[in-house]
Swiss-Prot record:
This is Glutamyl-tRNA(Gln) amidotransferase subunit A. Allows the formation of correctly charged Gln-tRNA(Gln) through the transamidation of misacylated Glu-tRNA(Gln) in organisms which lack glutaminyl-tRNA synthetase. The reaction takes place in the presence of glutamine and ATP through an activated gamma-phospho-Glu-tRNA(Gln). The keyword Cytoplasm does not apply. It comes from Streptococcus thermophilus (strain ATCC BAA-250 / LMG 18311). The lineage of its organism: Bacteria, Bacillati, Bacillota, Bacilli, Lactobacillales. The gene is gatA. Belongs to the amidase family. GatA subfamily.
Amino acid sequence: MSFNNKTIEELHNLLVSKEISATELTQATIDDIKAREEAVNAFVTVAEEAALAQAKAIDEKGIDADNLLSGIPFAVKDNISTDGILTTAASKMLYNYEPIFDATAVANAKAKDMIVIGKTNMDEFAMGGSGETSYYGATKNAWDHSKVPGGSSSGSAAAVASGQVRLSLGSDTGGSIRQPAAFNGIVGLKPTYGTVSRFGLIAFGSSLDQIGTFSQTVKENAQLLNVIASEDAKDSTSAPVRIADFTSKIGQDIKGMKIALPKEYLGEGIDPEVKETILDAAKHFEKLGATVEEVSLPHSKYGVAVYYIIASSEASSNLQRFDGIRYGFRAEDAKNLDDIYVNTRSQGFGDEVKRRIMLGTFSLSSGYYDAYYKKAGQVRTLIIQDFEKVFADYDLILGPTAPSVAFDLDTLNHDPVAMYLADLLTIPVNLAGLPGISIPAGFAQGLPVGLQLIGPKYSEETIYQAAAAFEATTDYHKQQPVIFGGDN
């Protein structure tokens, strides 16, 4: 029996009333994963034994009636550490790495008796926008298996969209939650930088990385964020939790809310059908009582260039730890220490990871630092200031999540620049450390279109309020791909 069409609240009621047990729900989730996994390749590891053991322990002590997520399974992106469960970052470099600790976000979820069902596939070390750079093969889009699911949190999005799990965790460095959420027609939130601890997240770009949430609905997304958000002494960039309940404004109307629509977000490079869908969504927000006005974010056009200098520079530093000495893959054909380093990194990293390490090393090198890395930091400040000017007069910013719907597998992965430009609309949010959400807003060419809502720092409850108002008066989130059990 499958429970994948039940909401979290419905599952909670079934668990509390003992109509089902946590063990039965976990086994049903494992069955849902197995039934769909060959088609989507969303998981690197299904932690069947550990999950059932965790569920049994929860059943023995009893479901907590006051804890909505007690006994609920969830999936975790494979760059987020899980105690005793392989955490590979979808790389040959970490093919055998089992952490001996949980990331703080995972520990927080387990403390609320959530059950880790497995680790999801992803672009290697979170470097990619299509789910195709994984050592374990490409993840497929839940709606059309010939299309990409987006990246880098490809498996976390596809798993939720295909009905394998109800909730999952991902990470977002330049759009890696929001873009796959858009491509798969689900809800994905990147919180304000520092809201969720990065302790236990395998670092890519430390000033950009943020753990976030995937779900079927806006409310369930907020419910999961309630559990994982926390200040953490183990992460010096974590911030005090300023919002007691991220669901607090869900259900409130948005009359009088001021929403900005940047002209740059609907300009050159945006698919005409995507543009039309977003303009229709803007009109819908106006019908709900909000004011939508055009604004300008003039420096957003530099976001991709700034991001790939800063993120690659940080990656070149962060990935120095993978050297074949301490843990993970080690090349066998080494004759000396230099050979260990060179051969291990040459064989252990994929092409995209090597490309970004080289770009970052170049940007930080003597003679180029000022021209590239320092200049990128200066333009990043201008991008932040653009947002601050808009948020002085507006509550939220609205736009498409991605310039297009999901594209064909094995196309843009041969054109790095074109792939990078797919993150054009999400990258500025990371550069500014802002929260952003993608929600389903319609369809183009038979594939989901994502609507992005961006707010000032620590405005997640307002973002959820607006997103939930849109969701409650549309039915896009109710439409499901065939693999889930839908008619599409």
